[in-house]
């Protein structure tokens, strides 16, 4: 039975960095892509340009990808426990910074599963975030903003705010559901 390699990604704007890590993953076994859902992304970053289904179609068409599964949480733990890969591969950019806690979780889970974490050098001078900034600088239409707002509302809970200026409106705000 072939070994399995888990790779989590957003997969919105495909670039050489994604292809590099997928190709490296195939050296270790069959590649399972944990494709972050809009819900998982919405609490940490801006929504992707493409919907989850569109991103899934793109990633599935990449030659070395064996399977694409939804990753509903920013944390990898639930998918690692569900799919029990032999390896997880990730760029080394998570060794420091805001995603370090995720790295620490992954190491603990993979140790428990008897698997291995493989970190490869992050591809320099290109990132989906940088490409997105360039695209955003070109501007968007009102229809694109409306479509993005609808997807965002569907992906994460709405925050409701009721302004209070006196005791009565304060009581109303406290008891409003």
Which functions belong to the PLM regions below?
Residues 18-27, 167-177:
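Short amphipathic alpha-helices and their capping/turn segments at secondary-structure boundaries
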Residues 131, 139-176:
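N-terminal amphipathic alpha-helix/helix-capping segment at the start of soluble metabolic enzymes
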